[in-house]
């Protein structure tokens, strides 16, 4: 929005052209979302307290979680609001990738909001019926996959189209799984669906301790922002042997907004948390990360950088599978962070150690740019 305005003003004075620079707009995006989150945070917390939108604690949760009862939830609304405003202000709104990510954010955020609201309003931990949740998240993720496929196939360069659809294998030069050979982009669309929904649910499962999910989200968004910047520049992409994708540079503005909004939320979510993000935040943020990973064609690297999210999700699958097949537990409690709590780790120890793991994994993900 402001990019368009400054482009009009550039005709009157050349100094307005400075806003065209992606690096400046990305920095302004961070500062804008950070400021919005910090300023509106106390207001949002007071409003949630007044509405009595407090967190319910499961009877199966570790004993030390009882003190979290009543802490305001649905704080993810503030995160999404900060990201949305910052993106609309500083991103190039003619870029289709910007609107796809925002669309995914809105739909997954709405599903998360409905899930949170039902849990609070009706004291029902089941939340939104699984069929409705599945339907709307499927609409958003499949819609994103179809849109990305159509954008890719509009290009006249067949090699470029293949680069936008095939699954890149990290640590190797020019090695990929050819999803593009399946007619009508079915393999690509289904794979996109799995990545977006998998990321959304994995982040949601991770969001069980104060600050545990939001900081890895910030770190992974930073890593994806680097890939978005490099893959959107044909010179960097060719030099680093990564796919050049025409529209991805503008995703840096969105990643920057996620970083600023996430850090602002962490200010109030740090232990002891004053507010929780709820499903409205976790589902949307995970879906956004998954969508951006698909756009920059770095799904496997995304799984590496988001290894904490992967471990949390896998721990739940293993626990459920083992209980059904063997009637035995693999972990003391799932997701994984609760297992370590049961072993005697303090909440802050679990959180900070998972942050450290994420830092190392994001660095490893970035190393794939040169280790080929």
UniProtKB/Swiss-Prot annotation:
Protein's pathway: Cell wall biogenesis; peptidoglycan biosynthesis
InterPro entries: Glycosyl_transferase_4, PNAcMuramoyl-5peptid_Trfase, PNAcMuramoyl-5peptid_Trfase_CS
Record field: transmembrane: 25-45, 73-93, 98-118, 134-154, 176-196, 211-231, 251-271, 275-295, 300-320, 349-369
Electron transport found in the keyword field: no
An annotated GO cellular component: plasma membrane
Reactions accelerated catalytically: UDP-N-acetyl-alpha-D-muramoyl-L-alanyl-gamma-D-glutamyl-meso-2,6-diaminopimeloyl-D-alanyl-D-alanine + di-trans,octa-cis-undecaprenyl phosphate = di-trans,octa-cis-undecaprenyl diphospho-N-acetyl-alpha-D-muramoyl-L-alanyl-D-glutamyl-meso-2,6-diaminopimeloyl-D-alanyl-D-alanine + UMP
Keyword terms of this UniProt record: Cell cycle, Cell division, Cell inner membrane, Cell membrane, Cell shape, Cell wall biogenesis/degradation, Magnesium, Membrane, Metal-binding, Peptidoglycan synthesis, Transferase, Transmembrane, Transmembrane helix
Location of the protein in the cell: Cell inner membrane
Membrane topology: Multi-pass membrane protein
Domain of life: Bacteria
Cofactor: Mg(2+)
Pfam families, sorted: Glycos_transf_4
UniProt cross-references to PANTHER family, sorted A to Z: PHOSPHO-N-ACETYLMURAMOYL-PENTAPEPTIDE-TRANSFERASE (PTHR22926), PHOSPHO-N-ACETYLMURAMOYL-PENTAPEPTIDE-TRANSFERASE HOMOLOG (PTHR22926:SF5)
Role according to the record: Catalyzes the initial step of the lipid cycle reactions in the biosynthesis of the cell wall peptidoglycan: transfers peptidoglycan precursor phospho-MurNAc-pentapeptide from UDP-MurNAc-pentapeptide onto the lipid carrier undecaprenyl phosphate, yielding undecaprenyl-pyrophosphoryl-MurNAc-pentapeptide, known as lipid I.
UniProt cross-references to NCBIfam families, sorted A to Z: mraY
Recorded family membership: Belongs to the glycosyltransferase 4 family. MraY subfamily.
Protein's recorded name: Phospho-N-acetylmuramoyl-pentapeptide-transferase
Organism, as annotated: Acinetobacter baumannii (strain AYE)
Gene name as annotated: mraY
């Amino acid at each position: 929005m402001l990019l368009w305005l400054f482009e009009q003003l550039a005709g009157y004075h050349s100094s307005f052209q400075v806003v065209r620079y992606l690096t400046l707009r990305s920095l302004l995006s961070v500062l804008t979302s950070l400021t919005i989150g910090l300023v509106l945070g106390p207001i949002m917390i007071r409003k949630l307290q007044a509405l009595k939108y407090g967190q319910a604690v499961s009877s199966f949760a570790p004993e030390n979680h009882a003190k979290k009862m009543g802490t305001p939830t649905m704080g993810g609304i503030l995160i999404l609001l900060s990201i949305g405003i910052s993106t609309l202000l500083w991103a190039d709104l003619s870029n289709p990738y910007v609107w796809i990510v925002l669309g995914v954010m809105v739909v997954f955020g709405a599903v998360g909001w409905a899930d949170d609201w039902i849990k609070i309003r009706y004291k029902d931990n089941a939340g939104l019926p699984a069929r409705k949740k599945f339907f709307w998240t499927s609409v958003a993720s499949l819609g994103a996959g179809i849109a990305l496929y159509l954008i890719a196939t509009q290009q006249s360069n067949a090699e470029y189209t293949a680069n936008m659809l095939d699954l890149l294998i990290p640590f190797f030069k020019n090695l990929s799984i050819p999803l593009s050979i399946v007619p009508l982009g079915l393999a690509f669309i289904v794979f996109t669906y799995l990545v977006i929904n998998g990321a959304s649910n994995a982040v949601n499962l991770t969001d069980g301790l104060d600050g545990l999910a939001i900081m890895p989200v910030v770190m992974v968004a930073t890593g994806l922002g680097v890939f978005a910047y490099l893959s959107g520049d044909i010179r960097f992409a060719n030099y680093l042997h990564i796919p050049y994708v025409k529209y991805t540079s503008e995703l840096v503005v969105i990643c920057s907004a996620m970083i600023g909004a996430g850090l602002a939320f962490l200010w109030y979510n740090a232990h002891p948390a004053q507010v929780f993000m709820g499903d409205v935040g976790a589902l949307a943020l995970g879906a956004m990360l998954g969508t951006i990973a698909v756009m920059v064609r770095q799904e496997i690297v995304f799984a590496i950088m988001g290894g904490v999210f992967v471990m949390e999700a896998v721990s739940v699958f293993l626990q459920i599978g083992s209980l059904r097949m063997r009637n035995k537990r693999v972990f003391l409690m799932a997701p994984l962070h609760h297992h370590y709590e049961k072993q005697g780790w303090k909440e802050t120890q679990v959180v900070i150690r998972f942050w450290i793991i994420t830092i190392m994994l994001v660095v490893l993900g970035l190393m794939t740019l040169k280790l080929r």
